């Protein structure tokens, strides 16, 4: 049975110019739906976003992707410079990108990041769209399609990861 109080993290290992194939490494994933209702934000919610490191240019490039998703959901992303925030974005060079899923972001201590975008200003727009839009969708509450319990695909996770 899923532990509804535990925040979920979606993590993708960064392999330039490849699509995300990583999955939530979580034994509870079978109980989740693509957009898990328990992790979706309340409708019309203001979701505060803070950049905890990175350059001004990285902030602009990332914020552009938050605004793009903002157009399609009935949520509003609000940038904050200081104080508490719902989503805390880092640009750490971890060779991975990840985000907590939906309101799971609020379970993370304020001194910890909830999203990592290992992107640089010299990465092209296609890469910024591919990675940042993907992670912002996780922050909204969406999971990967292959994690839907009714996908009917018998995944061999080890083979997929080793591919």
Language-model-derived ranges and their functions:
Residues 1-163:
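Zinc-dependent metalloendopeptidases
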């Amino acid at each position: 049975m899923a532990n509804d109080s535990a925040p979920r993290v979606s993590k993708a290992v960064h392999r330039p110019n490849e699509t995300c194939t990583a999955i939530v490494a979580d034994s509870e994933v079978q109980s989740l739906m693509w957009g898990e209702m328990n992790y979706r934000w309340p409708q019309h919610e203001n979701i505060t976003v803070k950049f905890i490191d990175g350059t001004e240019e990285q902030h602009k490039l990332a914020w552009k992707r938050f605004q793009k998703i903002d157009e399609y959901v009935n949520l509003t992303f609000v940038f904050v410079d200081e104080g508490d925030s719902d989503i805390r974005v880092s640009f750490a060079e971890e060779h991975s990108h990840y985000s907590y899923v939906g309101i799971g972001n609020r379970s993370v201590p304020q001194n910890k990041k909830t999203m990592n975008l290992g992107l640089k200003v010299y990465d092209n727009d296609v890469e910024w769209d591919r990675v940042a839009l993907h992670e912002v969708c996780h922050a909204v509450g969406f999971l990967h399609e292959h994690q839907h319990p009714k996908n009917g695909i018998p995944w061999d996770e080890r083979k997929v990861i080793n591919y």
